[in-house]
Amino acid sequence: MANAADFANALMQIVLANFELLTNAFSLLLNNSVDVAEVWNVSIHAAGFGYWFIKPFVGDGGALDVASKNVSAMKNISYAINYIGGNAETIFGNETGQKGLSAVMSHFVGLIDDEFALKVWNLAKSGVEVAMRMLENINSTLR
């Protein structure tokens, strides 16, 4: 059976994979492999797609709106929240970091080292460089 340290290791691998993915995407932009205007175009269309994607769930007549009018669905949601509240220490853990998510985060913090800090710094640095490059070209792109 997996323990908190195993979950912390899995979480660290996911975080490192996301760092690598973003760093590689930023390096494509910084090495002139992709046109900045195209990135702005994709960003604008992604925002529009996100609006239309989420509308059936949270808009008027969406799933959450319908569920709020369904008494049995609301009872199930209240039972779930009640269960989570009744087992808060088991789920979220205690202040000593021996149970639940606090144990996972305690182990996760133990995995952070100088190499991790360098990866965070390099990702942040390249992200700022990409943001500066995109903002430099905003006038010519959005005409």
UniProtKB/Swiss-Prot annotation:
Domain of life: Archaea
Name the record gives this protein: Uncharacterized protein AF_2123
